[in-house]
Each structure stands twice: as C-alpha cells, then as structure tokens.
Amino acid sequence: MSNSWWLKPAQAIDVPMREAALARQQQLTKPAGSLAQLERLAVQLAGLQGRERPAADKLWIAIFAGDHGVVAEGVSAYPQEVTGQMLHNFVNGGAAISVLARQLSAQLDVVDLGTVAPLDLPGVRHLRIGAGTANFAHGPAMSAEQGLAALQAGRDSVLRAKAVGTELFIGGEMGIGNTTAASAVACSVLECAAPLLVGPGTGLNAEGIEHKTRVIERALALHAEQAGDPLHSLFCLGGFEIAALTGAYLACAQEGIVALVDGFICSVAALVAVRLNPSCRNWLLFGHRGAEPGHRHLLETLQAEPLLDLGLRLGEGSGAALAVPLVRLACELHNGMATFAEAAVADRPA
C-alpha cells in the first residue's frame, strides 16, 4: 500500500538519559531495587522521554467508538444501541472513564468512527467511516479504504495530543461486540485456536461463550488466507475502533509519546501494531491484567509487565487510567527522593 506511514521507525530510546536515571536510582535513600517495578518504570520513562527526571502530568485519553456487524450473530450480552448511548454518557460525564479523566486532569477525546445510527453529539468528534463494520462471519469487516481511515483516525488523535504537550497517551474503546472482533483478530494474527482467547466479554454465560467461539471459528475458516498477516487480519475481522487504537499506538511511538495500554481489546490493537512495526514496542506500557481469559496470553506474547491486576473487564481505557497514579508516583519518587549524599545517610558498603 502506498504511503504506509505505520512502517516509519519509532523514535529511539535515549540511552544516556536512561543510564543517568538508573545511576540516580542507585543513589536514592533506599535499598537498591526495593521499589521494584516502580524503579524500572521511572528509568524506562527517562529513556523514552529523553530526560533524567521523567513526568506523566499531561495526560490525553482518546476513546474510539464504532459498531460491529458481527453482533447480528448473537455474540454479545448487550444490544447494539448501547454503543451510541455510551457516547452520550462519555461526554455528559457519567461514564467510568469520564470520572477518571476528571480526577486525573486529563484531556478526553471522544471519537465516533461509525455507530449504526448516526449521532449528532456536541463534544464528540464525528469521523464516521461507516454505519458500523460488516458482519465478518460472512465477509470482510471493512474495506482496505475504511481500515486505512481508521488507522489514520488514531494517528490524528495522537497528533492532537502532541500539539498540547501530552506526556502520556491512553487509548480506550467502545463498541458492542468488540471482544468478539478482538478475539478473532488475535487468533488470526497469532494463528491460534479460538478457545485460547475467547472469553465472556461483557458477561456471557458458558453457553454464550461456546456460541461466540463457534462464530469466531467459522470466521477464521472463512478468512484463513489472512492468517498471520496483521494488517489484513485487522481489516477482515476487526473494528474501526480497534484499527484506530492500532494507528494510535504506532503514532505514539513515531511521535515520541509514551502509550499506556488498557485491557484485552487494546492489547489486541497493541499486538497488531507491534507485528506491523516491532520498533513501536518500546513505547507501550501496560496498565493492567484484565479478567478476560485471553488477556494473560496476550501480555505474555508481548512480554508485558502490567502495573495492576484488579480483575477489571470494563474497557473504555479505565484500567490504564487507574494505573496513571502509579506512573506519576514512580516519577515523583524518582525525582523527589534524596540521594544518600544529599541526606547525609550512609550507603551500603561496596
């Protein structure tokens, strides 16, 4: 494809700054390694941000929304109109991510990529690509043109975030049926059996999970030619919001903004991004390990060390948002603690 912007290499890690941050960590008034993952996080951020003392104060949360044709197969516990209703809830301040964004002083960017029924909501950026995706149980979920538009929508949100000095980017999603789409994409990319990744989503019972698994298996057989191909798996089996998340993660790496990845659906988008452009992996932090059974497998595949494990399964970017205070505190500890010399505290003998 022409103008394959997503193949542009990610920005390089600033190794001298990472080493300077590590040296500082080793001089802070605590036993070496005693703050464990928080120490590693601060040092990692220093290398990514190119400064010895990193920060995560300026936060951007983008919520990408779109409907899914595969809902016609009866794979969701909720009706399709909930997608549009939740867009109202996001901008009216009543959703979980809305509350979290307020508490974290984050910019909330709500993007409608294609609900079934067109919406006219103040506070939502309407970038409609279609009236939801097509039913991937019978054909491709989207055309290449639609898929590229969705990737670009994610990139555009990151460019907006960069323009206001964002230090940490969170992508969230809303779309009834999107755990089905995400599971199908991941199975195709990883060429693995559906039962390994398929779970209850928003609350299916055992019978519902079995039906959802069968639908995905039929779709994987239909689109078998795309197996192992991340871009075409995304376009044939994914959703507009999953493609936008993929584009956002790729753009974050290219523009030098750290991305904090949410749960299962966002991790599938991260998987596609990394398979398309492995250099973007360094720029992805992972907020939590969710309750969806396949999430653990994805995190292991991505060699990710999530910050939280609370059994969450909401989506919306909520798990990543809940991890932001930990990221900020890791920075504050790194930046604000005294060294042994400054505090006149004896260090451990060499």
Curated annotation (Swiss-Prot):
EC number(s) from the headed UniProt entry: 2.4.2.21
One annotated GO biological process: cobalamin biosynthetic process
Matching Gene3D superfamilies: 1.10.1610.10, 3.40.50.10210
Molecular function in Gene Ontology: nicotinate-nucleotide-dimethylbenzimidazole phosphoribosyltransferase activity
Coiled-coil blocks: none
InterPro entries linked to this entry: Nict_dMeBzImd_PRibTrfase (IPR003200), Nict_dMeBzImd_PRibTrfase_bact (IPR017846), Nict_dMeBzImd_PRibTrfase_N (IPR023195), Nict_dMeBzImd_PRibTrfase_sf (IPR036087)
Keyword flag Transferase: yes
Superkingdom as given in the UniProt entry: Bacteria
Pfam families in UniProt: DBI_PRT (PF02277)
Uppermost EC category: transferase
Active site, per annotation: 316 (proton acceptor)
Catalytic activity: 5,6-dimethylbenzimidazole + nicotinate beta-D-ribonucleotide = alpha-ribazole 5'-phosphate + nicotinate + H(+)
UniProt similarity note: Belongs to the CobT family.
Purpose: Catalyzes the synthesis of alpha-ribazole-5'-phosphate from nicotinate mononucleotide (NAMN) and 5,6-dimethylbenzimidazole (DMB).
Protein name: Nicotinate-nucleotide--dimethylbenzimidazole phosphoribosyltransferase
Gene designation per UniProt: cobT
